[in-house]
Amino acid sequence: MAETKRSRKYSIRRATERDLPELKRMRIALQDLLIGRDPRVWRLSPELIDGLEEFYSKIMEKDQNRIFVAIPGKNGDSPLPRGRGSNPVQPPFSQPVAMLVVRILDNSNLDPVRFGRIDDAWVDPEWRERGVMTGLTRAAASFLAERRVSMVMLDWANNNPPSGTCWQKLGFEPLMTMGFASPTDILSRKE
């Protein structure tokens, strides 16, 4: 029986240094998606884009941070055919198809002081609506719960309705709206 897209298997694991090129690729894809939906979205600087691998490497170094990735295959390995009639070969390393960054932040001016923040959540288009973001988010929630973090926050763009729908299905509720304007636009408005 042919495998359907919905039945594809994946596993979630903590990102490693070997994943850095794919983390960079996925973050740039996220930026491209958001800019494609609304060119007013803030862009990553060229310097940050060039240094994304180092940026993610520094995030991975800290114990209060995690980057989780989704890997094709039940155990993170997707069999590759060797040829007609031969057994498949397990690759030594499978490339991620999704990512999610979660950090524990401390701010003594807020209550709760310690909270979680999710950033840079991405699933490659062919893996969407397959439960991958649910798996990544559950991994982040487990990480936070083990560290007794009681609240987690994230941002999603208004111009990306699928993202808002996804996050709300995962239990996030919109509590605040951020507004953006140029000073010139503000000054040019009539009362």
Where are these predicted regions, by residue range?
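Conserved GNAT acetyl-CoA-binding A-motif
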Residues: 144-156
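Conserved N-terminal entry element of GNAT/NAT acetyltransferase domains
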Residues: 1-21, 188-191
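Conserved GNAT-fold acetyl-CoA-binding loop/helix
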Residues: 28-55
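Conserved acetyl-CoA-binding loop-helix of GNAT-fold acetyltransferases
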Residues: 120-123, 129-142, 169
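A short helix-loop-beta-strand connector motif used in the catalytic cores of GNAT acetyltransferases and
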Residues: 51-69, 117
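Conserved active-site alpha-helix within GNAT-family acetyltransferase domains
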Residues: 134, 146, 158-176, 187
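Conserved beta-strand in the GNAT
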Residues: 69, 94-104, 117, 122
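Conserved acetyl-CoA binding element of GNAT-fold acetyltransferases
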Residues: 112-125, 177-180
